[in-house]
Protein backbone atom coordinates (compact mmCIF):
# COMPACT_ATOMS: atom_id res chain seq x y z
CA UNK A 1 0.00 0.00 0.00
CA UNK A 2 1.32 3.47 -0.76
CA UNK A 3 0.43 7.12 -0.29
CA UNK A 4 1.28 9.72 -2.91
CA UNK A 5 1.88 13.46 -2.87
CA UNK A 6 0.47 16.02 -5.30
CA UNK A 7 3.15 15.14 -7.87
CA UNK A 8 2.21 11.44 -7.70
CA UNK A 9 5.42 10.53 -5.88
CA UNK A 10 5.27 7.81 -3.23
CA UNK A 11 5.71 9.42 0.19
CA UNK A 12 4.72 6.53 2.49
CA UNK A 13 4.40 2.79 2.12
CA UNK A 14 3.79 -0.43 4.00
CA UNK A 15 2.77 -3.98 3.19
CA UNK A 16 1.49 -7.19 4.69
CA UNK A 17 1.90 -10.89 4.05
CA UNK A 18 0.12 -13.70 5.87
CA UNK A 19 -0.17 -12.43 9.46
CA UNK A 20 2.77 -10.02 9.26
CA UNK A 21 3.14 -6.31 8.64
CA UNK A 22 6.29 -5.18 6.84
CA UNK A 23 8.28 -2.66 4.85
CA UNK A 24 7.04 0.59 6.42
CA UNK A 25 8.67 3.78 5.23
CA UNK A 26 7.77 7.46 5.23
CA UNK A 27 9.68 10.02 3.18
CA UNK A 28 11.80 12.25 5.40
CA UNK A 29 10.12 15.29 3.85
CA UNK A 30 6.69 14.03 4.95
CA UNK A 31 7.42 12.77 8.46
CA UNK A 32 5.22 14.21 11.16
CA UNK A 33 2.15 14.30 8.89
CA UNK A 34 0.53 11.16 10.35
CA UNK A 35 1.15 9.07 7.23
CA UNK A 36 2.65 6.17 9.20
CA UNK A 37 -0.50 5.92 11.32
CA UNK A 38 -2.73 6.02 8.25
CA UNK A 39 -0.78 3.24 6.51
CA UNK A 40 -0.64 1.13 9.68
CA UNK A 41 -4.36 1.56 10.38
CA UNK A 42 -5.23 0.63 6.81
CA UNK A 43 -3.04 -2.50 6.84
CA UNK A 44 -4.32 -3.67 10.23
CA UNK A 45 -7.86 -3.27 8.87
CA UNK A 46 -6.92 -5.30 5.78
CA UNK A 47 -5.47 -8.02 7.99
CA UNK A 48 -8.55 -8.14 10.22
CA UNK A 49 -10.82 -8.43 7.17
CA UNK A 50 -8.66 -11.36 6.04
CA UNK A 51 -9.19 -13.02 9.42
CA UNK A 52 -5.63 -12.39 10.64
CA UNK A 53 -6.26 -11.10 14.15
CA UNK A 54 -2.88 -11.91 15.72
CA UNK A 55 -0.32 -9.81 13.85
CA UNK A 56 3.47 -9.79 13.94
CA UNK A 57 6.21 -7.51 12.69
CA UNK A 58 9.88 -6.87 13.11
CA UNK A 59 11.46 -3.47 12.91
CA UNK A 60 14.61 -1.52 13.65
CA UNK A 61 15.07 -0.68 17.31
CA UNK A 62 14.76 3.05 16.55
CA UNK A 63 11.37 2.51 14.86
CA UNK A 64 9.86 0.24 17.53
CA UNK A 65 8.51 3.23 19.48
CA UNK A 66 6.13 4.10 16.63
CA UNK A 67 4.65 0.60 16.65
CA UNK A 68 4.60 0.54 20.46
CA UNK A 69 2.59 3.77 20.45
CA UNK A 70 0.17 2.10 18.03
CA UNK A 71 -0.61 -0.92 20.21
CA UNK A 72 2.18 -3.36 19.40
CA UNK A 73 4.18 -5.14 22.09
CA UNK A 74 7.73 -6.41 22.14
CA UNK A 75 8.25 -10.17 22.01
CA UNK A 76 12.02 -10.24 21.61
CA UNK A 77 14.89 -7.90 20.84
CA UNK A 78 18.25 -8.40 19.17
CA UNK A 79 20.37 -5.69 20.78
CA UNK A 80 21.47 -3.04 18.33
CA UNK A 81 19.53 -4.63 15.50
CA UNK A 82 15.81 -5.36 15.58
CA UNK A 83 12.66 -5.86 17.64
CA UNK A 84 10.05 -8.58 17.05
CA UNK A 85 6.55 -7.36 17.98
CA UNK A 86 2.90 -8.47 18.08
CA UNK A 87 -0.46 -6.77 18.52
CA UNK A 88 -1.42 -8.71 21.65
CA UNK A 89 0.01 -7.66 24.99
CA UNK A 90 0.89 -11.18 26.13
CA UNK A 91 0.04 -13.22 23.04
CA UNK A 92 3.36 -14.98 22.57
CA UNK A 93 3.80 -15.53 26.31
CA UNK A 94 0.30 -17.05 26.48
CA UNK A 95 1.23 -19.34 23.58
CA UNK A 96 4.33 -20.49 25.46
CA UNK A 97 2.29 -20.99 28.64
CA UNK A 98 -0.20 -23.12 26.72
CA UNK A 99 2.66 -25.21 25.38
CA UNK A 100 3.72 -26.04 28.94
CA UNK A 101 0.25 -27.53 29.51
CA UNK A 102 1.07 -30.21 26.93
CA UNK A 103 4.41 -31.04 28.56
CA UNK A 104 4.76 -34.69 29.48
CA UNK A 105 7.41 -36.86 31.07
CA UNK A 106 9.73 -38.74 28.78
CA UNK A 107 11.28 -37.94 25.44
CA UNK A 108 9.51 -35.33 23.33
CA UNK A 109 10.08 -34.62 19.66
CA UNK A 110 8.67 -32.27 17.05
CA UNK A 111 7.92 -32.32 13.35
CA UNK A 112 7.12 -29.37 11.13
CA UNK A 113 5.49 -30.23 7.83
CA UNK A 114 3.74 -28.58 4.93
CA UNK A 115 1.82 -31.74 3.94
CA UNK A 116 0.91 -30.45 0.50
CA UNK A 117 -0.90 -32.83 0.37
CA UNK A 118 -0.65 -35.21 3.34
CA UNK A 119 0.51 -38.49 1.78
CA UNK A 120 1.17 -42.00 3.05
CA UNK A 121 4.83 -40.97 3.16
CA UNK A 122 3.97 -38.15 5.55
CA UNK A 123 1.88 -40.55 7.62
CA UNK A 124 4.78 -43.03 7.77
CA UNK A 125 7.13 -40.26 8.90
CA UNK A 126 4.75 -39.23 11.70
CA UNK A 127 4.16 -42.86 12.76
CA UNK A 128 7.90 -43.57 12.83
CA UNK A 129 8.69 -40.44 14.82
CA UNK A 130 5.80 -41.10 17.22
CA UNK A 131 7.05 -44.65 17.83
CA UNK A 132 10.43 -43.31 18.96
CA UNK A 133 9.28 -40.83 21.58
CA UNK A 134 6.78 -40.40 24.37
CA UNK A 135 5.20 -37.26 22.89
CA UNK A 136 5.39 -35.95 19.34
CA UNK A 137 4.45 -32.33 18.62
CA UNK A 138 3.30 -31.92 15.03
CA UNK A 139 3.31 -28.39 13.60
CA UNK A 140 1.59 -27.81 10.27
CA UNK A 141 2.73 -24.84 8.19
CA UNK A 142 -0.34 -22.63 8.04
CA UNK A 143 0.58 -20.27 5.21
CA UNK A 144 -1.81 -20.65 2.29
CA UNK A 145 0.70 -20.23 -0.52
CA UNK A 146 0.44 -23.72 -1.97
CA UNK A 147 -2.04 -25.56 -4.14
CA UNK A 148 -3.85 -27.25 -1.23
CA UNK A 149 -5.42 -24.81 1.27
CA UNK A 150 -4.44 -25.02 4.93
CA UNK A 151 -7.95 -26.08 5.99
CA UNK A 152 -7.81 -29.11 3.67
CA UNK A 153 -4.25 -30.01 4.69
CA UNK A 154 -5.22 -29.76 8.37
CA UNK A 155 -8.21 -32.06 7.87
CA UNK A 156 -6.08 -34.63 6.02
CA UNK A 157 -3.36 -34.54 8.69
CA UNK A 158 -5.82 -34.87 11.58
CA UNK A 159 -7.47 -37.86 9.91
CA UNK A 160 -4.09 -39.40 9.13
CA UNK A 161 -2.80 -39.17 12.71
CA UNK A 162 -6.05 -39.88 14.59
CA UNK A 163 -4.79 -43.37 15.55
CA UNK A 164 -1.67 -41.94 17.25
CA UNK A 165 -2.51 -40.97 20.85
CA UNK A 166 0.92 -39.50 21.62
CA UNK A 167 0.83 -36.93 18.80
CA UNK A 168 -0.14 -33.38 19.75
CA UNK A 169 -1.23 -31.31 16.76
CA UNK A 170 -0.42 -27.59 16.79
Where are these predicted regions, by residue range?
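Conserved beta-strand in the GNAT
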Residues: 2, 8-25
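Conserved catalytic loop/helix region of short-chain dehydrogenase/reductase
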Residues: 25, 29, 143
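Conserved GNAT acetyl-CoA-binding A-motif
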Residues: 47-60
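Active-site beta-strand termini and strand-to-loop segments that position acidic
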Residues: 4-6, 87-88
